[in-house]
Swiss-Prot record:
It is a multi-pass membrane protein. The gene is GPR22. It is found in: Cell membrane. The keyword Chloroplast does not apply. One of its GO terms (cellular component) is plasma membrane. Orphan G-protein coupled receptor. Seems to act through a G(i)/G(o) mediated pathway. May be involved in ciliogenesis. Disulfide bonds: none annotated. Belongs to the G-protein coupled receptor 1 family. Residues 67-85, 137-156, 230-315, 371-433 are cytoplasmic. One of its GO terms (molecular function) is G protein-coupled receptor activity. This is G-protein coupled receptor 22. The chain crosses the membrane at residues 46-66, 86-106, 116-136, 157-177, 209-229, 316-336, 350-370. The keyword Cell membrane applies.
Length: 433
């Protein structure tokens, strides 16, 4: 605390006059101590700015590509995924900049309103992210386990998203309700209640001040349990055993296919040897057809194994990313509810909040850029962009660019205009005839 010196001069005379010379105006512009160390502020602000740039750029790219292609919006899964990307854009625009403001504020400033808005944004980001991830998990379970009879139709998906935004908005209002922001009484009653902001160790330990934490914690743990159960069911539906690369059933099926193919080959060879010269051609054809069928079966088996590996890998990445980003702050919120807030816990909460905001970068990578349809749309847009740049800036001296995107060899049509080349091509046909 900075106290202004007061110079008191007591003059005793006949009238006992007391003169007080206040020199408050001298120190009004003095340096006020910051609430956090400079290194702490610089490091966290740098990470938050990086999350704003990367998260905003990637999520806007995904939303623009989804809106440009109508066939992507027609899918229920893509609409639910777009809802998550819209949320990430809101977090990058509104929540992360407010966290930067909280980091750079001083102790002596009146931060009650800003702290209240910050807690509201944190509550909104936590609850809405968990609910959106929960909705995407249900959609993937619906696709993998019940592809023929889907529960999430287009109408139900729209109702689900409306309910998600209503609940998220309610979670945003909870910190304001805690401090009686909307009460009709005197407006100064709520200003002294700081919500998890580093102040002068003046924290309210009443349970009514932390209802927003009581909402965030159970929603997070419920989402984690549902994710673990749902992705386990998805892996079981795809015949993937956790901890093993391939199941025994697949190995038995492969062995049966091999034995059947070998017996068919032996039978074909025996039949060809026992038959006369007329059946030689038939035996060769059957052996060739068996070989082709074997190759197709092996190819299908490899594609299925690759798909299983990809699904298993993506499931692990989705679950581990959500746990890595949101588990620390959820555990710390539980600790604050049990022990009460302190300066150390509030500083740790800001660090863990930076980790939680990292989902704005990981969500486009996990839910959009890994989809094959989205990759095709992105490649087509990049091709058109490259072609437009080349057409706008032609190279001098009639230079030719050999690019697989612009001038693929497989699309070239070979034309023979010379009569000599035509005659050379027609010579073998005349000889065989």
């Amino acid at each position: 605390m900075c106290f202004s010196p007061i110079l008191e001069i007591n003059m005793q005379s006949e009238s006992n006059i007391t003169v007080r010379d206040d020199i408050d105006d001298i120190n009004t512009n003095m340096y006020q101590p910051l609430s956090y160390p400079l290194s702490f502020q610089v490091s966290l602000t740098g990470f938050l700015m990086l999350e704003i740039v990367l998260g905003l750029g990637s999520n806007l790219t995904v939303l623009v590509l989804y809106c440009m292609k109508s066939n992507l919006i027609n899918s229920v899964s893509n609409i639910i995924t777009m809802n998550l990307h819209v949320l990430d854009v809101i977090i990058c625009v509104g929540c992360i900049p407010l966290t930067i403001v909280i980091l750079l504020l001083s102790l002596e400033s009146n931060t009650a309103l800003i702290c209240c808005f910050h807690e509201a944004c944190v509550s909104f980001a936590s609850v809405s992210t968990a609910i959106n991830v929960f909705a995407i998990t249900l959609d993937r379970y619906d696709i993998s386990v019940k592809p023929a009879n889907r529960i999430l139709t287009m109408g139900r998906a729209v109702m689900l998203m409306i309910s998600i935004w209503i609940f998220s908005f309610f979670s945003f209002l909870i910190p304001f309700i805690e401090v009686n922001f909307f009460s009709l009484q005197s407006g100064n009653t709520w200003e002294n209640k700081t919500l998890l902001c580093v102040s002068t160790n003046e924290y309210y330990t009443e349970l009514g001040m932390y209802y927003h934490l009581l909402v965030q914690i159970p929603i997070f743990f419920f989402t984690v349990v549902v994710m673990l159960i749902t992705y386990t069911k998805i892996l079981q539906a795809l015949n993937i055993r956790i901890g093993t690369r391939f199941s025994t059933g697949q190995k038995k099926k492969a062995r049966k296919k091999k034995t059947i193919s070998l017996t068919t080959q032996h039978e074909a060879t025996d039949m060809s040897q026992s038959s006369g010269g007329r059946n030689v051609v038939f035996g060769v054809r059957t052996s060739v057809s068996v070989i082709i069928a074997l190759r197709r079966a092996v190819k299908r088996h490899r594609e299925r194994r690759e798909r299983q590996k990809r699904v298993f890998r993506m499931s692990l990445l989705i679950i581990s990313t959500f746990l890595l980003c949101w588990t620390p702050i959820s555990v710390l919120n539980t600790t604050i509810l049990c022990l009460g807030p302190s300066d150390l816990l509030v500083k740790l909460r800001l660090c863990f909040l930076v980790m939680a905001y990292g989902t704005t970068i990981f969500h486009p990578l996990l839910y959009a850029f890994t989809r094959q349809k989205f990759q095709k749309v992105l490649k087509s847009k990049m091709k058109k962009r490259v072609v437009s740049i080349v057409e706008a800036d032609p190279l001098p001296n009639n230079a030719v660019i050999h690019n697989s995107w612009i001038d693929p060899k497989r699309n070239k049509k070979i034309t023979f205009e010379d009569s000599e080349i035509r005659e050379k091509c027609l010579v073998p046909q005349v000889v065989t005839d």
